[in-house]
Swiss-Prot record:
Gene Ontology BP annotations: arginine biosynthetic process via ornithine; L-arginine biosynthetic process
Family note: Belongs to the lyase 1 family. Argininosuccinate lyase subfamily.
Source domain of life: Bacteria
SS bond partners: none
UniProt enzyme class: lyase
A Pfam family this chain is assigned to: ASL_C2
Listed NCBIfam families: argH
Metabolic or biological pathway: Amino-acid biosynthesis; L-arginine biosynthesis; L-arginine from L-ornithine and carbamoyl phosphate: step 3/3
Listed GO CC annotations: cytosol
Protein name (Swiss-Prot/TrEMBL): Argininosuccinate lyase
A GO term for molecular function: argininosuccinate lyase activity
Enzyme Commission code(s) on record: 4.3.2.1
Length: 461
């Protein structure tokens, strides 16, 4: 094949304009599908030989040629040509140069439409498996840190105001639970990714006696796509993955926001290792939490990719349209960003320095045991709404004295309810508050440790 000649140029009277060639080419980004394109081509060629569509000698030549191409790509010696448009035609051009007529037969019973859909599914299946492993790694880091901090007391917040004492380990376990659901969603998404489009050809199937089940088995697909139009035209599997990725990034963005707050000297709850921070070009004292900030920022980009893919597909008639070429860059960047974020996060949390005393003092400053006092009154027979009102008045009184509820005298507390006795001070301690939530899902250290054991049992060894 001539270098500048297109595989489809037979019915055209003039060459493609240079600007159009650059505008429509995808080789600048879809080259990363090369390994999956080769895998799909090998399986397709073996099926063609098994069904008698090509000869065994053709298959041998194709296998040898694709092996050489794979090696050239791995060594960086493969010549990617813009005029060949995409990864598929670049590989076919080289294969034909190496094998002659055998290479020209490879595309029998196949279109680039079902070819690229297969490549993307193979790529995404691998990416999902890698991302799930990275999620598990991060979960183990969270569990290790939660175990170390099971009895560390921090203020729990609502509306970013001190609400009730919680274990820092319990707080970290909340993110483990989010990631657990994230992993489950990806596992479920993988089922719909793992279906074979090859055999759908351009849109209507093929008149050749292909064995789609053979190809599916060789490539590790659970099933074939059962409608040829759907197989080549939809990208809902990629959209679903990007939705899963957006949820993961949203969860990590929430944790990032907390790390940024906790690192602020006004909180002083944690320190990030220097390797995850940067300084200021003008302020010598600055240690900026760039990694959490970028996670927060990159979450917006991942959300944008999801919307881009939804918008890409929303008005396309069946079947394949060139619009679908625009599916790859958002998908690739989503995969890359998510993998990098999970990898960095596991390392960053593993080196987190915790300041338990700062957390404790923050809990003491916010009347975090006020609900415990209300519950104490209820257990003494006071209706909850009356107890709520009495404690609200007690908090206001403590504020006027610039002290915590636990620092008020018994006489002071009895101003607000005569049922209060000396035992009230047991429930007004931070430790007492934690211990009282001793039920599954609660923040008592004992429950936190049991939750960690249960969580470990659910993760792969």
């Amino acid at each position: 094949m001539e270098k500048d000649k297109k595989t489809w140029s037979g019915r055209f009277s003039e060459p493609v304009a240079q600007l159009v060639q650059r505008y429509t080419a995808s080789i600048g980004f879809d080259y990363r599908l090369a390994e999956y394109d080769i895998q799909g081509s090998l399986a397709h060629a073996r099926m063609l030989a098994a069904t008698g569509i090509i000869q065994p000698a053709d298959l041998a030549a194709i296998e040898q040629g694709l092996a050489q191409i794979r090696e050239e790509i791995s060594k960086g010696e493969f010549e990617w040509q813009l005029e060949q448009e995409d990864v598929h035609l670049n590989i076919e051009r080289r294969l034909t140069a190496l094998t002659g007529d055998a290479g020209k037969k490879l595309h029998t019973a196949r279109s680039r439409n079902d070819q690229v859909a297969t490549d993307i599914r193979l790529y995404l299946r691998t990416a999902i498996d890698e991302i799930i492993d990275l999620i598990h790694t991060l979960q183990y880091v969270l569990l290790d840190l939660a175990e170390q901090q099971a009895a560390t007391i921090m203020p729990g917040f609502t509306h970013l105001q001190v609400a009730q004492p919680v274990s820092f380990g319990h707080h970290l376990l909340a993110y483990h639970e989010m990631l657990q659901r994230d992993g489950q969603r990806l596992q479920d998404c993988r089922k719909r990714v793992n279906q074979l489009p090859l055999g759908a050809a351009a849109l209507a199937g093929t008149s050749y006696p292909v064995d789609r089940a053979m190809v599916a088995y060789e490539l590790g697909f659970d099933d074939i796509c059962h409608n040829s139009l759907d197989a080549v035209s939809d990208r809902d599997f990629a959209i679903e993955f990007c939705a899963c990725a957006a949820l993961i990034m949203m969860h990590l963005s929430r944790l990032s926001e907390e790390l940024i707050l906790w690192m602020n000297p006004a909180f002083g709850f944690i320190r990030l290792a220097d390797r995850f921070c940067t300084g200021s070009s003008i302020m010598p004292q600055k240690k900026n939490p760039d990694v959490p900030e970028l996670v927060r920022g990159k979450t917006g980009r991942i959300n944008g990719h999801l919307v881009a893919l939804l918008t890409l597909m929303k008005s396309q008639p069946l079947a394949y349209n060139k619009d679908n070429q625009e599916d790859k860059e958002p998908l690739f960047d989503t995969v890359d960003t998510l993998k990098d974020t999970l990898t960095i996060y596991a390392d960053m949390l593993a080196g987190l320095h915790v300041n338990p005393e700062a957390m404790r003092q923050a809990a003491l400053r916010g009347y975090a045991t006020a609900t415990d006092l209300a519950d104490y009154l209820v257990k003494k027979g006071i209706p909850f709404r009356d107890a709520h009102e009495a404690v609200a008045q007690a908090v206001r009184f403590a504020e006027s004295k610039a002290c915590d509820l636990s620092e008020l005298s018994l006489a002071d507390l009895r101003q607000f309810s005569e049922v209060i006795e000396q035992d009230v001070f047991e429930v007004l301690t931070l430790e007492g508050s934690l211990q009282s939530r001793n039920h599954p899902g609660g923040t008592a250290p004992e429950q936190v440790r049991e939750a960690i054991c249960r969580a470990r049992s659910q993760l792969p060894g």
